[in-house]
Curated annotation (Swiss-Prot):
It holds the Pfam family Ribosomal_L9_N. This is Large ribosomal subunit protein bL9. HAMAP family: Ribosomal_bL9. One of its GO terms (molecular function) is structural constituent of ribosome. Gene3D superfamilies: Ribosomal protein L9, C-terminal domain (3.10.430.100), Ribosomal protein L9, N-terminal domain (3.40.5.10).
Length: 149
C-alpha cells in the first residue's frame, strides 16, 4: 500500500516521502496515529499544497524538543534517596517512573516513556548516567545520584 508520510518514521522515511508499506501497518498504525495518509491523487495534491506548513510545524516541534533537552542537560545531577543495604545494594530498584518523578520535581517535566535505561533499572547506590529521548532525533543526559536513606 502506498502512503505519504506526514512525520518522520523510524526505518521508513521522513516528511513527504511516498513509501510502500504493508496494508495492516498503514491501516492499524500509521494512519490512526496521523503519521501517514494513503497516496491517492487527491491526498498527493492536498499534501503538496500544505507541504510548507507541515515542514514548519515539524521544525517547531524539533525546536521545542531541543529547548527541553537543554533544560534537562542544565540539571546535570539529580539525587534520589532509596533504602539500601550495607554493600550499597538497593532494596528494590529505581526505574523509569522514579527517575521521571525526580527530574520533574527538579523542575523539568519529563514523561517516563522518555527515560532510557540502557543497562536496565538502577540497583546500586552511586552515580548513574541516564539518557532521555525527548524527540526521535533529540537526546539529553543527566547523572542520577542514588544515595542510601
Amino acid at each position: 500500500m502506498q502512503v505519504i508520510l506526514l512525520d518522520k518514521v523510524a526505518n521508513l522515511g521522513s516528511l513527504g516521502d511516498q513509501v510502500n508499506v504493508k496494508a495492516g501497518y498503514a491501516r492499524n498504525f500509521l494512519v490512526p496515529k496521523g503519521k501517514a495518509v494513503p497516496a491517492t491523487k487527491k491526498n498527493v495534491e492536498y499534501f503538496e499544497a500544505r507541504r510548507a506548513e507541515l515542514e514548519a510545524k515539524l521544525a517547531d516541534v524539533l525546536a521545542a524538543a531541543n529547548a527541553r533537552a537543554e533544560k534537562i542537560n542544565a540539571l546535570e545531577t539529580v539525587t534520589i534517596a532509596s533504602k539500601a543495604g550495607d554493600e550499597g545494594k538497593l532494596f528494590g530498584s529505581i526505574g523509569t517512573r522514579d527517575i521521571a518523578d525526580a527530574v520533574t520535581a527538579a523542575g523539568v517535566d519529563v514523561a517516563k516513556s522518555e527515560v532510557r535505561l540502557p543497562n536496565g533499572v538502577l540497583r546500586t547506590t552511586g552515580e548513574h548516567e541516564v539518557n532521555f529521548q525527548v524527540h526521535s532525533e533529540v537526546f539529553a543526559k543527566v547523572i542520577i545520584n542514588v544515595v542510601a536513606e
